[in-house]
Amino acid sequence: MFYQDPFDVIIIGGGHAGTEAAMAAARMGQQTLLLTHNIDTLGQMSCNPAIGGIGKGHLVKEVDALGGLMAKAIDQAGIQFRILNASKGPAVRATRAQADRVLYRQAVRTALENQPNLMIFQQAVEDLIVENDRVVGAVTQMGLKFRAKAVVLTVGTFLDGKIHIGLDNYSGGRAGDPPSIPLSRRLRELPLRVSRLKTGTPPRIDARTIDFSVLAQQHGDNPMPVFSFMGNASQHPQQVPCYITHTNEKTHDVIRNNLDRSPMYAGVIEGIGPRYCPSIEDKVMRFADRNQHQIFLEPEGLTSNEIYPNGISTSLPFDVQMQIVRSMQGMENAKIVRPGYAIEYDFFDPRDLKPTLESKFIHGLFFAGQINGTTGYEEAAAQGLLAGLNAARLSADKEGWAPARSQAYLGVLVDDLCTLGTKEPYRMFTSRAEYRLMLREDNADLRLTEMGRELGLVDDERWARFNEKLENIERERQRLKSTWVTPSAESADEVNTHLTTPLSREASGEDLLRRPEMTYAQLTSLAAFAPALEDEQAAEQVEIQVKYEGYIARQQDEIEKQLRNENTLLPATLDYRQVSGLSNEVIAKLNDHKPASIGQASRISGVTPAAISILLVWLKKQGMLRRSA
């Protein structure tokens, strides 16, 4: 039977991608349905209890700048906040927070249940309704059919999921949850390229059985960082430390002596695992010269005794897991409350997607999250928001939107996936971005919130706060530009105490702030340049914009030069055999990838600068040289 009301957008899956997709589509005014196999696990952290990190924190800030949910949720659930790379330049600084799993899940569910235009329904989806290469709905396990103009698949590791502990395995979407086998079979019938990936998680430890007195503590930062541009530290719950232990030669001997019982090394697991979050078996074998590896003992919550040992993800048998855990300092009497495991699952080649994350072959069908070959909550959330907003735009008969690589880490993520694809779980790093000085955490709102407002993602409260911040930045910069001090002035003596070389000529506040030894806080503590802005976010922007002005201007020039060709469009129907002068290898790769632009084509392995020049000349001769807006 059909459900009585049609929807504009259906989201299948309630993880980090699905919840952002649902919120985005609903915020844009579209009637949205979120289908999940279990309402109680909406926003569940399936692996590590943390949000953010290098590259990942940048994505969270961008999701927040576009009105998303993740940053707000972690501000309400974070039990330890830190700035990573704090001593380095602003481009690579990143926020990370330990999370209370229960509080995080509660924050996500509360937001979803209070979002207008959004209905949540508990039923596993087993089929899609596809008519003439267009998706028009979904069918649940009890045969209930829902119609919609667009469907977003955010099913994580559930598609034909198989859990491995030692040489034993069983079907599962994650520990304690069933897999999605009928939907996996249905998707394999569609003209989509599918393969298998693998990820894993460590055993969870009972905190009462760990001797923390012999371990080093790791505390959060003070003052506490905040994730959301709309948040403040008063929202944070109680803060707690993490602890650090290490593997040792005994640990490594246990692992080496039991490799024949590892499903990965025994050839039972075929899927490729994440390069940058390897299992402890992989670390011991790949880095044989290391006699220890650092392990972070992270609390799972304020009301839980479970500890997440970050760094010992494993699929070895349970008895071996016990030996590994008890070989480490402070863990000699530790008890495991949940075994570690590996999970294999289906993923679909993201090269079959448009930059909007819509399928190139099934109109109205969008993919987001681990189903696209990524790993991590943050990568999933960013894709979910993009897929949700584009599903909403499609249902409203509007053109899709995707950020450029020079505009957002989300743009880098999507371009990498859709252009290059991936053969292993993809993780975001700042090193993946060519223009990372422009793509900082601190300016995510300056880059994206105005666009978010145009798209209908940003509400009035966020828009008002954003404009107030812009005004504060502009007003303060003008004040510093117009406030001067001369070497002979009485205030010069106070200024000189903060300078490595005393003033020799008249200087404005901005001139002084450009000096490497002068911070904004120091400058505004001086009588001549007081008071400091109360708006801490605006104050940070003033300091960064002034200190890095020359570097930022230079990178902006590089971006503009690159964009002249980057945005030159390539016809979707172009057969590259028509372009004389291209090698057979280049023709094959371009016909296989079908890049949407010259920029995408230039990032395909094997497509040379000479081939790009030939393409540009050919497009010009054919009168097909046009650029996207």
From Swiss-Prot:
GO terms, biological process: tRNA methylation; tRNA wobble uridine modification
Alphabetic keyword roster: Cytoplasm, FAD, Flavoprotein, NAD, tRNA processing
Localisation: Cytoplasm
Record-linked SMART domains: GIDA_assoc_3 (SM01228)
Gene3D superfamilies named among the record's database cross-references: FAD/NAD(P)-binding domain, GidA associated domain, C-terminal subdomain, tRNA uridine 5-carboxymethylaminomethyl modification enzyme MnmG/GidA
Residues that, per the record, bind FAD: G13, G14, G15, H16, A17, G18, V125, S180, Q370
Cofactor: FAD
Chain sites annotated for binding NAD(+): 273-287
Function (record text): NAD-binding protein involved in the addition of a carboxymethylaminomethyl (cmnm) group at the wobble position (U34) of certain tRNAs, forming tRNA-cmnm(5)s(2)U34.
Family: Belongs to the MnmG family.
Subunit field text: Homodimer. Heterotetramer of two MnmE and two MnmG subunits.
Identification of the protein by name: tRNA uridine 5-carboxymethylaminomethyl modification enzyme MnmG
Annotated organism of origin: Salmonella schwarzengrund (strain CVM19633)
